[in-house]
Amino acid sequence: MKTILSNQTVDIPENVDITLKGRTVIVKGPRGTLRRDFNHINVELSLLGKKKKRLRVDKWWGNRKELATIRTICSHVQNMIKGVTLGFRYKMRSVYAHFPINVVIQENGSLVEIRNFLGEKYIRRVRMRPGVACSVSQAQKDELILEGNDIELVSNSAALIQQATTVKNKDIRKFLDGIYVSEKGTVQQADE
């Protein structure tokens, strides 16, 4: 069954400015600018109201799969708005049973060097995605903090660090060493 018209709106806060170029959404906020291209999805994007403070996503004659993309786009835009206002912060913790994992940040937080993982001499180097800064926590031992505006780049950088410390040729139920995401949040606290 095809639905004639289905739509959803996203409310835009006061301090955020959104511009549309075709199906490319550009979000400007206090922390910076994010852009995302939705050209591969056949939907209509439009700004509503005198102050352009709502973004509407329309889909005409969509089946079930196509209608699901409406909410997906709205979620992506909401994440972009959250990113340019609050920013995203992921915290990662080093876990080790015997050999302490030594993490060094190089090149102003864009390169992570992992040494002494399971006592190995090999140095693992993980480059952060552009726009993601990594730092070692001062308050907590063995903790890394990743910060950025784009949730996909921040979470992808965290995944690259976690995958760099995979244990090979051992029983992973016993060898739990690695660097894992411990907390996901925002850089600034939301005013409730």
UniProtKB/Swiss-Prot annotation:
It comes from the Eukaryota. The modification N6-acetyllysine is found at K121. Component of the large ribosomal subunit. Component of the large ribosomal subunit. The ribosome is a large ribonucleoprotein complex responsible for the synthesis of proteins in the cell. This is Large ribosomal subunit protein uL6. GO terms for molecular function: rRNA binding; structural constituent of ribosome. It comes from Macaca fascicularis (Crab-eating macaque). GO terms for biological process: cytoplasmic translation. It is found in: Cytoplasm. GO terms for cellular component: cytosolic large ribosomal subunit. Keywords: Acetylation, Cytoplasm, Ribonucleoprotein, Ribosomal protein. Its main location: cytoplasm. Belongs to the universal ribosomal protein uL6 family. InterPro entries: Ribosomal_uL6-like, Ribosomal_uL6-like_a/b-dom_sf, Ribosomal_uL6_a/b-dom, Ribosomal_uL6_CS2.
